[in-house]
Regions:
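Active-site cofactor/cluster-binding pocket
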Residues: 2-169
């Protein structure tokens, strides 16, 4: 069974076909809620859309929402992705299994959404005081790694951040 996508390419329908093995700490969840949060121009919307598209290629149901707010003017915005093995009843994120925070305001402002066993992944250059919570936290200097390894800070930061998220999920 296949379906035609907006791009015109045929791909297996959701829930059919082989699924790649997932090995990260959140891989075995039937429903996974992720929030990407940061300031304007950090790529949080693009990261959410990219993760949602990747999850559909993994034959999973996906809901993706985003809030721009004042993010494009220096405030912070977010992109939420809900990934499930079953149809999604409610597309808005209520609690998060994974919070990806690219700035201090986002980490502080959204940490309360994390489930007790949740995971916080943050940019350790921009989040100098990670919020305390019961789950696990991983600080990664995404921007510095991107610049040192590739020489391009902005776009490569998005790729590195998504790579960390894919490994966890």
């Amino acid at each position: 069974m296949s379906e035609i996508t907006a791009s015109g390419f045929s791909q297996p329908a959701i829930g059919t076909g082989p699924r790649p093995e997932r090995t990260g700490p959140l891989a075995e969840r039937d429903l996974l809620a992720v929030r990407f949060a940061g300031t304007g121009l950090q790529g949080v919307i693009l990261m959410g859309v990219a993760l949602a598209m990747a999850a559909t290629r993994d034959h999973r149901y996906v809901a993706q929402t985003q809030t721009y707010g004042l993010g494009e003017r220096g405030g912070y915005g977010h992109s939420d992705v809900i990934i499930s093995d079953l149809p999604i009843d409610y597309p808005e994120l209520e609690t998060a299994d994974l919070l990806v925070a690219l700035c201090q305001d986002a980490a502080t402002g959204y940490a309360g959404l994390l489930r007790p066993e949740g995971i916080l992944v943050y940019d350790s250059e921009n989040v100098t005081e990670p919020p305390a919570f019961a789950g696990s936290a991983f600080g990664i200097p995404f921007g510095r790694l991107a610049e040192e390894e590739v020489g391009l800070r902005d776009t490569t930061t998005i790729v590195l951040t998504l790579g960390a998220v894919v490994r966890i999920t």
